[in-house]
Structure formats: structure tokens, C-alpha cells
Regions:
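N-terminal FAD cofactor-binding segment of flavoenzymes
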Residues: 15-67, 77-78
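Fold-independent oxyanion-binding glycine-rich loops
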Residues: 9, 31, 133-134
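Short beta-strand to alpha-helix junction loop
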Residues: 66-86
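N-terminal Rossmann-like FAD-binding beta1-loop-alpha1 element of flavoenzymes
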Residues: 2-27, 223-238
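Hydrophobic beta-strand segments of well-ordered beta-sheets in folded domains
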Residues: 3-5, 24-27, 128-131, 205-210
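Class I S-adenosyl-L-methionine
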Residues: 18-21, 84, 88
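Predominantly flavin-linked oxidoreductase catalytic cores and closely associated redox partners
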Residues: 90-207, 214-237
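Glycine-rich nucleotide phosphate-binding loop and flanking beta-alpha elements
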Residues: 13, 35, 137-139
Length: 240
């Protein structure tokens, strides 16, 4: 049984923690007060079965899937809550408001220095493997950042894409003058509109919520399915 540390409570980080938590001791570090808040990703699943294998029937029902032409819409913030609970039930240690201040690697282990966390104390975590998934998370409060290491393999810089999303009444889709790159009709009478940048168009009733992110994925690749596939590939890498 290995000691695994995952930095970043993204969908990728949560799925990876659930997979690793069945076989290893896992610590999930997130700089936010609550994982998935604010939610800055589309609530978009292309194929339900990709997510259903991680959730039970009651959890699936709670997400209130609604079919769209490009898959299914769901409440992204609810998914974060459900996956966080599942990770905790598997024994994953979750450190919130926790910032990595230093990472030192040797041939046999990685030493991670942190500040904050559940006990609001500085700490040292020694692990066999660390995954840095901070690129997939929302911007940190107060512009706080982790201090990570630069590795030519796992931590190499990727191309970043900026996305802007807005939530409005579903009826507003008839009034759009700027075609969104991604549109998701939700079960709650609301609709997610996603663009590469904030549109000049404004809903007549205004934006109920606005979201922004900068991550290494184009908008067309931001389905929850792709996040799951990436997490699964990282988990498989532990065995190679």
C-alpha cells in the first residue's frame, strides 16, 4: 500500500482519489474552503455510463440528468459534493484551505511542505507519489497559489485555454445573438452558456451566475467524461 498525495480537488483529482483510495493511503489537498466551490466547469456528461460506474442509483437521481443534443446536463456543484463524500468514505484524507509551499523529490519519496489545512498548522507529508492537478481547479481565493516543482514529464507546462460561462433562464436561449460554443439545458429551468470569452450579448433577465476558468483543455474537451478518462489514465500509471 503506497502513500499517494493529490493536489487539486478537480473532477480529475476526486476520481483519482476514489480509485487510489481503494488500494492506497490517499491525501487530497485543496486550497479552497470547499472542494468544487466555486464550480467553474460545465455540468456536461457525454455518456452517462462513464459517470454511473462511480455512483449509485440515488446519487445519479440526485444529479437530475437532462438529455441534450450533445449529451446530458447536470448540476456540477452537486457532483463535486457527491464525489467528495465518496472519497471521504473510502478513507481519503481531505485537507481544505491547505497550500503547498515546497516539494522535494528524491529517488524513493516526495516530501511536501504545507501551510493551513484542517488543523491550520504547517505540516510535512511524505509520499510515494504526488499528482499535481491544480491546473484543473478554480482560481484560488486571494490569488493564493501552491508552490510546486517543475518536472519535464508530469509537470510540464501545457497550453492553457480561457473559458467563460454564464447561467441564465432556459427561455433566454431564444434570445441569444452570440452563438455559444457549448449550451446545456438543465433540469432546473436554467441553461449554461459557454464561450471562449465573455459575450457582448446579455440575457434580458441578466446572468444568474458567471464562471471563468483557465485550464489545459479546449471547451470541446471539457466534458466530465474526459476528466474521468484522464483520472483513470493517471491511476493506471501507478502500475507501470
Amino acid at each position: 500500500m503506497s502513500e499517494i498525495v493529490i493536489v487539486g480537488g478537480s473532477i480529475e483529482g476526486l476520481i483519482l482519489s476514489i480509485l487510489c483510495g481503494k488500494e492506497h493511503n490517499v491525501t487530497l489537498i485543496d486550497i479552497h474552503p470547499e472542494i468544487g466551490f466555486p464550480c467553474v466547469i460545465p455540468g456536461w456528461v457525454e455518456r452517462r455510463e462513464n459517470l454511473e460506474k462511480y455512483l449509485d442509483d440515488e446519487e445519479i437521481a440526485h444529479l437530475k440528468f437532462l438529455q441534450n443534443p450533445n449529451g446530458f446536463a447536470l448540476r456540477g456543484e452537486w457532483l463535486f459534493k457527491i464525489l467528495t463524500i465518496k472519497a471521504a468514505q473510502l478513507g481519503v484524507r481531505i485537507l481544505l484551505r491547505c497550500r503547498v509551499t515546497k516539494v522535494e523529490e528524491s529517488s524513493q519519496q516526495t516530501t511536501i511542505s504545507t501551510i493551513g489545512g484542517n488543523n491550520t498548522r504547517d505540516g510535512i507529508i511524505i509520499c510515494d507519489k504526488m499528482f499535481d492537478l491544480t491546473e484543473y481547479t478554480a482560481p484560488a481565493p486571494g490569488k493564493l497559489q501552491h508552490t510546486m516543482i517543475d518536472s519535464p514529464i508530469q509537470y510540464a507546462s501545457k497550453q492553457s485555454f480561457h473559458h467563460w460561462g454564464g447561467i441564465a433562464l432556459s427561455s433566454e436561449q431564444q434570445n441569444t445573438t452570440v452563438e455559444p460554443k457549448l449550451q446545456l439545458m438543465r433540469d432546473d429551468g436554467l441553461c449554461e452558456f459557454w464561450y471562449d470569452q465573455k459575450p457582448t450579448w446579455q440575457p434580458k433577465t441578466g446572468w444568474i451566475e458567471q464562471m471563468q476558468n483557465t485550464i489545459p483543455k479546449a471547451l470541446e474537451e471539457m466534458s466530465i467524461d474526459n476528466s474521468i478518462v484522464y483520472a483513470e489514465s493517471l491511476f493506471e500509471s501507478l502500475n507501470h
